[in-house]
Amino acid sequence: MKVVHTVGKRRTAIARATAKEGSGKIRINKKPLELMEPKYIKMKLMEPVILAGEALSNIDVDIDVKGGGIVSQMDATRTALGKAIVEFTGKMDLKEKFLSYDRTLLVSDARRTEPHKPSKSSKGPRAKRQKSYR
C-alpha cells in the first residue's frame, strides 16, 4: 500500500498531509472537507480537489494542521494537499496545471513577520518618533 507524507507551511501554521489509497475522502483535523467553515475557507480548500478531478477518486488524504490563524492554516493545508496529490499520482501534467493555476498549491510561502528592533520594540520593527520641523 502506497503512503505519501507531505508538509505545507504558511507563517506559523504547519499542515502535515498523509495520502494513501482509498475512496477519495479528504479530512482536515479529522473533519471532512465538506464540513469546513466559513464558506470562503472551504472554497479555497476545494481548488486543488477540483483541479485534480478524477485523479483524486482513489486517494484518501488526512491532514493535521496546527498553529497560526484560520487563513494561514487554510494556505498551509492547500499546499500540503496539492503536494500530496501530485506526489501520490506522479503525474507531471497535474503538477503543471497546479503551477499555472496558483504556485502556492505546490510551493510554501517563505514570507515571515519581521522581528521587532530594540528601540521601540512594542511598536513594531520600524517604528520611529515623528519628526517636527517647528
UniProtKB/Swiss-Prot annotation:
Gene Ontology biological process terms in this record: maturation of SSU-rRNA from tricistronic rRNA transcript (SSU-rRNA, 5.8S rRNA, LSU-rRNA); translation
Protein's UniProt name: Small ribosomal subunit protein uS9
UniProt KW keywords: Ribonucleoprotein, Ribosomal protein
Gene source species: Methanococcus maripaludis (strain DSM 14266 / JCM 13030 / NBRC 101832 / S2 / LL)
PANTHER family hit by this protein: RIBOSOMAL PROTEIN S16 (PTHR21569:SF16), RIBOSOMAL PROTEIN S9 (PTHR21569)
Family (UniProt): Belongs to the universal ribosomal protein uS9 family.
Region Disordered: start-end pairs: 109-134
Gene Ontology CC annotations of this record: cytosolic small ribosomal subunit
Molecular function via GO: RNA binding; structural constituent of ribosome
Coiled coil: none
Biased composition (Basic residues): 118-134
